[in-house]
A protein has these predicted regions:
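Flexible metal-binding regulatory segments at protein termini and peripheral loops
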Residues: 1-77
Length: 77
Protein backbone atom coordinates (compact mmCIF):
# COMPACT_ATOMS: atom_id res chain seq x y z
CA UNK A 1 0.00 0.00 0.00
CA UNK A 2 1.38 3.42 -0.96
CA UNK A 3 0.75 6.16 1.59
CA UNK A 4 1.15 9.90 1.07
CA UNK A 5 1.98 11.75 4.27
CA UNK A 6 1.87 15.55 4.53
CA UNK A 7 4.06 17.21 7.16
CA UNK A 8 4.19 20.83 8.34
CA UNK A 9 7.66 21.69 9.66
CA UNK A 10 8.46 24.62 11.95
CA UNK A 11 11.74 26.49 11.53
CA UNK A 12 12.63 25.10 8.11
CA UNK A 13 13.03 28.45 6.36
CA UNK A 14 15.63 27.93 3.65
CA UNK A 15 16.58 25.66 0.79
CA UNK A 16 19.57 24.50 2.85
CA UNK A 17 17.23 23.51 5.69
CA UNK A 18 14.92 21.70 3.26
CA UNK A 19 17.92 19.75 1.93
CA UNK A 20 18.89 18.73 5.48
CA UNK A 21 15.36 17.40 6.09
CA UNK A 22 15.35 15.62 2.71
CA UNK A 23 18.64 13.91 3.57
CA UNK A 24 17.30 12.84 6.99
CA UNK A 25 14.11 11.42 5.45
CA UNK A 26 16.14 9.46 2.88
CA UNK A 27 17.42 7.33 5.75
CA UNK A 28 13.95 6.14 6.80
CA UNK A 29 13.07 2.64 5.57
CA UNK A 30 10.02 2.53 3.35
CA UNK A 31 10.14 6.11 2.06
CA UNK A 32 9.81 6.08 -1.73
CA UNK A 33 9.93 9.82 -2.42
CA UNK A 34 10.07 13.02 -0.40
CA UNK A 35 9.16 16.42 -1.83
CA UNK A 36 10.57 18.86 0.73
CA UNK A 37 9.93 22.57 0.40
CA UNK A 38 10.35 25.42 2.86
CA UNK A 39 8.00 24.68 5.78
CA UNK A 40 6.51 21.43 4.53
CA UNK A 41 7.13 17.99 3.09
CA UNK A 42 5.05 15.52 1.12
CA UNK A 43 6.30 11.99 1.59
CA UNK A 44 5.29 8.86 -0.29
CA UNK A 45 6.08 5.60 1.45
CA UNK A 46 5.10 1.97 1.36
CA UNK A 47 3.39 2.01 4.75
CA UNK A 48 6.39 0.77 6.74
CA UNK A 49 7.50 4.29 7.69
CA UNK A 50 5.61 5.31 10.82
CA UNK A 51 4.73 8.84 11.87
CA UNK A 52 7.17 8.41 14.75
CA UNK A 53 10.03 7.52 12.36
CA UNK A 54 9.24 10.45 10.07
CA UNK A 55 9.03 12.89 13.00
CA UNK A 56 12.24 11.45 14.47
CA UNK A 57 14.15 11.99 11.22
CA UNK A 58 12.93 15.58 10.94
CA UNK A 59 13.80 16.30 14.58
CA UNK A 60 17.25 14.76 14.04
CA UNK A 61 17.75 17.33 11.27
CA UNK A 62 16.95 20.03 13.85
CA UNK A 63 13.33 20.92 13.04
CA UNK A 64 9.92 20.46 14.68
CA UNK A 65 6.86 18.84 13.13
CA UNK A 66 3.70 20.86 13.79
CA UNK A 67 1.29 18.66 11.83
CA UNK A 68 1.44 15.25 10.20
CA UNK A 69 -1.34 13.42 8.39
CA UNK A 70 -1.84 10.70 5.85
CA UNK A 71 -3.65 11.99 2.78
CA UNK A 72 -4.33 8.92 0.67
CA UNK A 73 -3.61 5.25 0.44
CA UNK A 74 -3.08 3.58 -2.90
CA UNK A 75 -2.04 0.03 -3.72
CA UNK A 76 1.65 -0.42 -4.51
CA UNK A 77 2.14 -1.43 -8.12
Amino acid sequence: MRVTTSVAIDGMLSVHAAHAVYTALAGVDGIITADVKVGRATIEHDGRATHEQIIGAIELAGYRVTEIRDERRLPLL
